[in-house]
């Protein structure tokens, strides 16, 4: 059994003053729209991640709807061959979000899954998560010694670097996120090719104004 909550105008709930508390539609109400309470929610039925739910941060007489960006997690597993090619071929972890949007990374978990045969080897190789085209770093250098070269399943938890807070808007807008080897050579070893690296990134997509 279902009940139609919304009327033909896309409005669902209003308060005692008949101001709108909850609504939906294909077009987000314009700035300065009226009759939406502060904190009113708008479900954008044509939206996607980061643009599906909006909240009125303005007033009843002058609305200002802003997207509510939810945190999602993207998991990407790299093969042994991909790990050993990260210097020449960085691996895309999150695709570019679209014009006027940026990816805000909350945390990164790297999981080395040891295949049981032989380890990766490295000398001065480190990893970094960065915005693809601009090369702006999202994290500081992720030390691979004691991590990627282990002969057991190993986990590294990484948080974004504060330096990214000073990035120009053009360096982070509509940019994909990639994992890169910043060392002087490729990671080697694991001749059996049975080690993998699982990259889990928690992130939000925000719309720049």
Indicate where each model-derived feature is located.
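Short, surface-exposed terminal/edge motifs of secreted or surface/virion proteins that either
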Residues: 41-71
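Beta-rich globular "head" domains
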Residues: 37-39, 84-134, 197-208
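Extracellular/surface-exposed low-complexity repeats and stalk/linker segments enriched in Gly/Pro
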Residues: 2-48
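Extracellular receptor-binding modules and their adjoining Ser/Thr/Gly/Asp/Asn-rich linkers
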Residues: 2-5, 10, 55-57, 72-78, ...
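Exposed beta-sheet edge/beta-hairpin loop segments within beta-rich domains
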Residues: 97, 164-197
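Terminal beta-strand-rich extracellular "head" domains
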Residues: 119-170
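Surface-exposed loop/edge segments in extracytoplasmic proteins
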Residues: 62-66, 72-77, 135-145
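C-terminal interaction-tip segments
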Residues: 74-76, 80, 183-209
